[in-house]
A protein has these predicted regions:
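Class I S-adenosyl-L-methionine
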Residues: 1-60, 163-164
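Alpha-helical scaffold segments in soluble metabolic enzymes
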Residues: 22-25, 49, 72, 76, ...
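A contiguous loop/helix-start segment that scaffolds small-molecule binding in enzyme catalytic cores
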Residues: 28-32, 98-170
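Class I SAM-dependent methyltransferase SAM-binding "motif I" and its flanking Rossmann-like core
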Residues: 34-107
């Protein structure tokens, strides 16, 4: 497990850089299997970085498919992405346009500071009382899917890196 990189890193960029460097270093002396939860191409920056830096270093990287949390979320909430769903990382909510005419999934609402930033950006578009869905640990035994008003978002104690917010279609 590479959890210690997350505990020691100051930013996600730093954490990802250290993980990729470590994995590529291990590849010099042995075959390595690097496994991520869910799909390796959904919200997994380290995989993209491994492919790019692996190619540059002459290391063969094979990426195999896996099911992401999004497939579970679509099923639980009866969302058909073919009809339109906007998926944003929490760090992009303030800087990217949000289409309020389709359901919006905001991933990686990983702490109260991020939740507060997301809340403030969304309240400008939807209003304080808008009811979103908090999706926490989906498909795990302690899964929570519950309504939450936007103004309450940063008051929730169960927020971590496996927390998302869904803004249903208006």
């Amino acid at each position: 497990a590479l959890d210690h990189f997350y505990e020691d890193g100051k930013t996600f960029e730093e954490v990802y850089d250290h993980i990729v460097s470590y994995v590529l270093d291990q590849c010099r002396s042995q075959d390595v299997v690097y496994v991520v939860p869910g799909s390796p191409v959904v919200a997994e920056n380290t995989v993209t970085m491994l492919v790019e830096r692996g190619q540059a270093a002459g290391v063969a990287v094979t990426v195999l498919p896996g099911m992401s949390f999004l497939e579970v979320l679509y099923t639980r909430l009866h969302l058909d992405p073919v009809n339109g769903v906007l998926i944003l990382d929490s760090s992009d909510v303030a800087s990217l346009p949000v289409d309020t005419t389709v359901p919006v999934v905001i991933t990686q609402v990983y702490d109260k500071r991020v939740a507060s930033d997301v809340k403030l950006s969304l309240m400008d578009l939807y209003g304080d009382e808008y009811e979103a869905l908090l999706v926490h640990h989906i498909s795990l035994p302690d899964e929570i899917v519950r309504p939450v008003k936007l103004y309450e978002l940063d008051r929730i104690d169960t927020i971590d890196h496996l927390t998302s917010l869904v803004l249903p279609e208006p």
